[in-house]
């Protein structure tokens, strides 16, 4: 079963049709890149997935774990695991990067589980996991102690 499925999606903004019949299926653990020239609808698709009010779905459907999300508000979609990673992310003082990663990890773990059990990793377990793996993506240990996106280089933000 597809985790995210977009079926013949048509989207307009201010009465102008931007997306025309978009289809996409993603499976568990898959990573996809949406690429295209300026004005091709990449941002429109991202904002539509998150339920931005300026974008109207005129036909088609968006399914997350087999259920339509078209009637869900943005925060409800986020609780189900849909997030948008910005090209130029805002700095968030007071929110630790490792806390953000753990929250994301727990949301993804829950979404990938086949049963209804809670599957949260403790702070201690996650800190150990991070220390063992942070170097694999070319980052230093002090990276984890920073606030979200605060003082990161462009390359660090992308990682």
Spans of model-derived segments:
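Short coil-to-beta microelement around the adenine-binding A-loop and adjacent beta1/P-loop entry
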Residues: 16-19, 76
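Conserved structural motif at the start of ABC-family nucleotide-binding domains
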Residues: 4-6, 19
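Short hydrophobic beta-strand immediately N-terminal to the Walker A/P-loop
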Residues: 32-34, 46
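ABC ATPase NBD Q-loop/coupling interface
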Residues: 61-77, 149
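Helix-to-loop junction immediately C-terminal to a conserved catalytic motif
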Residues: 50
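The feature captures the beta-strand-to-loop junction immediately N-terminal to the Walker
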Residues: 35-40
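ABC-family P-loop ATPase nucleotide-binding domains
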Residues: 90-159
